[in-house]
Swiss-Prot record:
Record bears the keyword Nucleotide-binding: yes
Gene: mutS
SUPFAM superfamilies in the cross-refs: DNA repair protein MutS, domain I (SSF55271), DNA repair protein MutS, domain II (SSF53150), DNA repair protein MutS, domain III (SSF48334), P-loop containing nucleoside triphosphate hydrolases (SSF52540)
Pfam families found in the cross-reference section: MutS_I, MutS_II, MutS_III, MutS_IV, MutS_V
Function per UniProt: This protein is involved in the repair of mismatches in DNA. It is possible that it carries out the mismatch recognition step. This protein has a weak ATPase activity.
GO molecular function, one term: damaged DNA binding
Protein name: DNA mismatch repair protein MutS
CDD domains linked to this entry: ABC_MutS1 (cd03284)
GO biological process: mismatch repair
Length: 858
C-alpha cells in the first residue's frame, strides 16, 4: 500500500487505516484530528468543514480535513448518528521526546451501538445486539448497553421473533457471524436500516458468561463481548454478568403493536408527547427514566411481581408527605449507572466524581425516608440500599467542590487530603507573595513607577519595562526579550523564586493528577455495588412516579381474576384523557364474561371505535406493569400477549402495502395467540376489494372464535358480519351510539350493546366538505345498493376455514342463494369504481362526471 514519495507520517496513517477500512480515521496531529484521502472528502461534505490538501504542490495532493481535538466530540456524534464508525488514533508519546515519527495507536472505535460519550446526552438506552444461529431457524440473541453495563441474552425460535426483538430494543447496530444468510443480512441492513458488523471470534469471560445459558446464547454473548473488546480496546469492569431472559416472562407485543398503541412515542410525530411514556413519566432520575421505558416495553405476566409493585404504589399513595420528601431527595441523584461506566472507561473527570459523591450523600436520606414509612412492603427495596459511606467519604474528602472537568490543570484535590500536595501549594502561595515583594522593592529602588512583574510560558516571570524607562533599568537586571515598545528583564533573585514556584507548580500538578487517578481507581472497585444501588434507586423512582400519576389522574388499583373475565367500569383512554382533560372525556365500560370471547364493533368512522380498543390495551398494559389504571373499577385476567392491527399504515420497515401488512399481522395473531391473549383488529380487510375483505374478515373471526379463543375486539365496517352473533355463541355485537335529529348526526362516543343500524359514512363525507350534489347522488346509490344487499354466509362453526367451505358455497349457489363471492348485477362494479375514486383530489366537475358514469352502470 506504500507509495514511493509518501512521508513516514503518512505511511503510518495508511498502515493504521488499513486495519479500519469501514471507519472514519481521526488521526491526532498536535491540536487537531486530521482525516485524509476519501475520509477527508466524505467528512468535509457531511460535517461541513473545509477540505484542503497535503503537499499542495505535488502532482496528486492528498485531500485533508481536520477538526480541533477539544471539540472533536460534536463531530464524532454527527458521524455516529448517521450510522458511521469512527476510529480515534491518539499520539502515544510526547512529540517533543519522540525519535522519528510520533507513535500513534487507535485507542477506541466509536460505533452507533457503543456510544458512551456524547455532546447530546440522552437518558435512553443504546443497545448493541448480537445474533447467532447454526441452522437459520433457532437464534441466540444477546444485547448490551455499553453506557450502563446492562447485558442480557435469550433464545428465539424463528427469525420473525429476532426481527421483532431488535425493533423493540431500538438497536442501531447488529453484530453477526459470517454464517448468517444473505437474505437475513439484507433484511437487517436494507429493510431495517441497521449497521451490520461482523464478528466470528468469541471472548470467553467466565466472570460475565453464565454457563447455564444455551450454546447459541453463549455464542451470541461471547461475540458481543469480543466486538466490544475490539472496538473499545480496554477492559470494562462495569459490564454486568449476562442475564438470561424469556420473551414469555413478559406481556408479548410486536414492535408494530407498541407503535400503534403509542407506548414509547407518538406514532404520528415520533415524539414523546402523547405517548404512554409521556403520561407516566414523573421520574426524577435518569436511571428511573430508563427503567420506566423498560417496564412499559415489558409488562409482567407474573401475578406475584405485579402485586409487589402494586403494594408499594399503594403505600406511596397512602403516605403523601413521606412520598413528597422522597421525591425531593431523588432530584439530587445523578445517573449512577453512566457515572460508573465512565469510571470503567477511564473517562470520569473530577466533576463526574463530584456528582457521584453528591449522589452518595443523598442515599442515606433516601433510605431513612423509606424506613420512615414503616411499611413491610418497602422492605424489599430498603434492604437493597447500600449507602457505601466509605466511598462517599473518599470522594467528598478528596475532590475539591470547585474542581473543573479537566484533570491536568490542578485545583482538583482538596487541601488537607495529601500533606505533600499541601506543601507544594504553600510554596506556590508564598512564592506569589515573594514575587509581589520583589516587584515592590525593585519599583522603589529603580524609580520606575510602572514597573511590574508578568508571566508567560516562554519567558517565565519577568520585569516589564517600557522603552521610555529603559534608562532607569538597574545594572543587576538582565534582558530576557525585546519587544517593539518594551523589554523584558530578569534578576537572579527573581529567577531563584521563579524556579521554586514553577517547580512547586509542576510537582503539584503532577501529584494532583496521580492522586486523582488513585481515587478513581478506588471508585472503580465499587462499580458492581454502584450498579446494584442504581437498580434499586431506579425501581423506587419508577414506583413513586406511577404513584404520582395515579394520584393526579384518580386511577384505581386493578384486580385480577382467573375466570378469564374483563370488567372495566367507566374506563378511559389514559393518554387521550390527559390531552383532552377529564371533564371532556367520555368514559366507556368494557365487559367480557367467561363465555364471551369476541366483541364485534360497528359504528361510523371517527366515532371512537379505535379509541375504545386502544383504551382496553392501555388498561391491560398499565395494569400488568404493576401500575394503577384509568377507570372507576377494573378486574382483568393476566394476558400473555397483545396483537393489534389498528390504523391503515403501510409497513415503513419492509415496504409492504397496507393490505399485505394487515394479512401478515393477522397471520401472527392467529398463529401465535393463545386463549390468554388479547387481539384488537380495526377494519381488517379494508385494503382489498369489498367481497375479498368481507370473506377474510368473516373467516378470521370464525377462526379466532373456534380455535384461538382469545379475547378479541373486532371493529368492522362490514355490517353484514353482525349476523355472525346468531351462529357464534361467544361473539357479541356492540356499536358506537349516535344521535340523529333533523337530518343531523352527532357521534356520542359511547359504546352500547347490539349492532349499529347505519354506517353514517356519507355523514362523515359531509363533515369532510364534499360537494352537496355529490353527497346526494351517493345517498341515492347507497339506497340502491342496500336494496340488493349481500347476504352473509355462515359456515359450520366447528371449522372456520376448511375444504368443506367450497361444498357449502356450491350448494348455496344451486339453491339460488347469493354467495359472498358472487356479485349481484353490477353492484360490485359500482363499488369498485367508487373505491377507486380519489375524492380528496376531485374537482366538482370531475365529481359530476364520475357520478354520471356510475349511473350508467346501474
Amino acid at each position: 500500500m506504500a507509495k514511493p514519495t509518501i512521508s513516514p507520517g503518512m505511511q503510518q496513517y495508511l498502515d493504521i487505516k488499513e486495519n479500519y477500512p469501514d471507519a472514519f480515521l481521526l488521526f491526532r496531529m498536535g491540536d487537531f484530528y486530521e482525516l485524509f484521502y476519501d475520509d477527508a472528502v466524505k467528512a468535509a461534505q457531511i460535517l461541513e468543514i473545509s477540505l484542503t490538501s497535503r503537499n499542495k504542490n505535488a502532482e496528486k495532493p492528498i485531500p485533508m480535513a481536520g477538526v480541533p481535538y477539544h471539540s472533536a466530540q460534536q463531530y464524532i456524534d454527527v458521524l455516529v448518528e448517521l450510522g458511521y464508525k469512527v476510529a480515534i488514533a491518539e499520539q502515544m508519546e510526547d512529540p517533543k521526546k519522540a525519535v522519528g515519527v510520533v507513535k500513534r495507536e487507535v485507542v477506541q472505535v466509536v460505533t452507533p451501538g457503543t456510544v458512551v460519550e456524547s455532546t447530546k446526552p440522552d437518558s435512553a438506552n443504546n443497545f448493541l445486539v448480537a445474533i447467532d444461529s447454526q441452522d437459520q431457524q433457532t437464534f441466540g440473541l444477546a444485547y448490551m448497553d455499553v453506557s450502563t453495563g446492562e447485558f442480557q441474552a435469550t433464545l428465539l425460535t424463528d427469525f420473525e421473533s429476532v426481527r421483532s426483538e431488535i425493533l423493540n430494543l431500538k438497536a442501531r447496530e447488529i453484530v453477526v457471524g459470517y454464517q448468517l444468510t444473505d437474505e437475513k443480512n439484507h433484511l437487517l441492513t436494507k429493510q431495517m436500516n441497521l449497521l451490520l458488523s461482523y464478528e466470528d471470534e468469541r471472548l470467553n469471560d467466565i466472570h460475565l458468561i453464565d454457563e447455564q445459558l444455551t450454546d447459541l446464547e453463549i455464542s451470541a454473548a461471547e461475540k458481543l463481548l469480543q466486538y466490544v473488546h475490539r472496538t473499545q480496546k480496554r477492559e470494562l469492569s462495569h459490564l454486568q454478568k449476562v442475564v438470561h431472559y424469556e420473551i414469555k416472562d413478559y406481556l408479548q407485543m410486536s414492535y408494530a403493536t407498541k407503535n400503534s398503541l403509542d407506548l414509547l412515542e407518538n406514532a404520528r410525530t415520533s415524539k414523546k408527547h402523547g405517548s404512554l411514556y409521556w403520561l407516566l413519566d414523573e421520574t426524577k432520575t435518569a436511571m428511573g427514566t430508563r427503567m420506566l421505558r423498560t417496564w412499559i416495553d415489558r409488562p409482567l405476566v407474573s401475578m406475584n411481581r405485579i402485586k409487589e409493585r402494586q403494594d408499594i404504589i399503594q403505600v406511596f399513595l397512602d403516605y403523601f408527605f413521606e412520598r413528597n420528601d422522597l421525591t425531593e431527595s431523588l432530584k439530587g441523584v445523578y445517573d449512577i449507572e453512566r457515572l460508573a461506566s465512565r469510571v470503567s472507561f477511564g473517562k470520569a473527570n473530577p466533576k463526574d466524581l463530584l456528582q457521584l459523591g453528591q449522589t452518595l450523600s443523598q442515599i442515606p436520606r433516601i433510605k431513612m425516608i423509606l424506613q420512615s414509612f414503616n411499611q413491610p412492603e418497602l422492605d424489599i427495596v430498603v434492604n437493597k440500599i447500600d449507602t457505601m459511606p466509605e466511598l462517599e467519604s473518599l470522594i467528598n474528602t478528596a475532590i475539591a467542590p470547585e474542581a473543573q472537568a479537566t484533570i491536568t490543570e490542578g485545583n482538583i484535590i482538596k487541601s488537607g487530603f495529601d500533606k505533600q500536595l499541601d506543601n507544594y501549594r504553600t510554596v506556590m502561595r508564598e512564592g506569589t507573595g515573594w514575587i509581589a515583594d520583589i516587584e515592590a522593592k525593585e519599583r522603589a529602588a529603580s524609580g520606575i513607577g510602572t514597573l511590574k512583574i508578568d508571566y508567560n510560558k516562554k519567558d517565565g516571570y519577568y520585569f516589564h519595562v517600557t522603552n521610555s524607562n529603559l534608562s532607569l533599568v538597574p545594572e543587576h537586571f538582565f534582558r530576557k526579550a525585546t519587544l517593539k515598545n518594551s523589554e523584558r528583564y530578569g534578576t537572579a533573585e527573581l529567577a531563584k523564586i521563579e524556579g521554586e514556584v514553577l517547580e512547586a507548580r509542576e510537582q503539584s500538578s503532577n501529584l494532583e493528577y496521580d492522586i486523582f487517578m488513585r481515587v478513581r481507581a478506588q471508585v472503580e472497585s465499587y462499580i458492581k455495588r454502584l450498579q446494584e444501588l442504581a437498580k434499586t434507586i431506579a425501581t423506587v423512582d419508577v414506583l413513586q412516579s406511577l404513584a404520582v400519576v395515579a394520584e393526579n389522574h384518580h386511577y384505581v388499583r386493578p384486580k385480577f381474576n382467573d375466570e378469564h373475565q374483563i370488567k372495566i367500569k367507566n374506563g378511559r383512554h389514559a393518554t387521550v384523557e390527559k390531552v383532552m382533560g377529564v371533564q371532556e372525556y367520555i368514559p366507556n365500560s368494557i365487559y367480557f364474561d367467561s363465555q364471551t370471547d369476541i366483541q364485534l364493533i360497528t359504528g361510523p368512522n371517527m366515532s371512537g371505535k379505535s379509541t375504545y380498543m386502544r383504551q382496553l390495551a392501555l388498561t391491560v398494559i398499565m395494569a400488568q406493569m404493576g401500575g394503577f389504571v384509568s377507570a372507576d373499577e377494573v378486574d382483568l385476567p393476566v394476558f400473555d400477549a397483545i396483537f393489534t392491527r389498528i390504523g391503515a399504515a403501510d409497513d415503513l420497515i419492509s415496504g409492504q402495502s397496507t393490505f399485505m401488512v394487515e394479512m401478515m399481522e393477522a397471520n401472527q395473531a392467529v398463529k401465535r395467540a393463545s386463549d390468554k391473549s388479547l387481539i384488537l383488529f380495526d377494519e381488517l380487510g379494508r385494503g382489498t376489494a369489498t367481497y375479498d375483505g368481507m370473506a377474510l374478515a368473516q373467516s378470521i373471526i370464525e377462526y379466532i372464535h373456534d380455535r384461538v379463543r382469545a379475547k378479541t375486539m373486532f371493529a368492522t365496517h362490514y355490517h353484514e358480519l353482525t349476523d355472525l352473533s346468531e351462529q357464534l355463541t361467544r361473539l357479541v355485537n356492540v356499536h358506537v351510539a349516535t344521535l340523529e335529529r333533523d337530518g343531523e348526526v352527532t357521534f356520542l362516543h359511547k359504546i352500547e350493546s347490539g349492532p349499529a343500524d347505519k354506517s353514517y359514512g356519507i355523514h362523515v363525507a359531509k363533515i369532510a366538505g364534499l360537494p352537496i350534489d355529490l353527497l346526494d347522488r351517493a345517498t341515492d346509490i347507497l339506497s340502491q345498493l342496500e336494496a340488493d344487499a349481500v347476504q352473509l354466509i355462515v359456515s359450520a362453526p366447528q371449522e372456520a376455514v376448511t375444504a368443506d367451505l367450497n361444498e357449502e358455497l356450491d350448494s348455496e349457489k344451486q339453491q339460488g342463494q347469493l354467495s359472498l363471492f358472487e356479485e349481484p348485477s353490477n353492484a360490485g362494479r359500482v363499488i369498485e369504481e367508487l373505491e377507486a375514486i380519489d375524492i380528496m383530489n376531485l374537482t366538482p366537475m370531475q365529481a359530476m362526471n364520475a357520478i354520471f358514469d356510475l349511473k350508467k352502470l346501474l
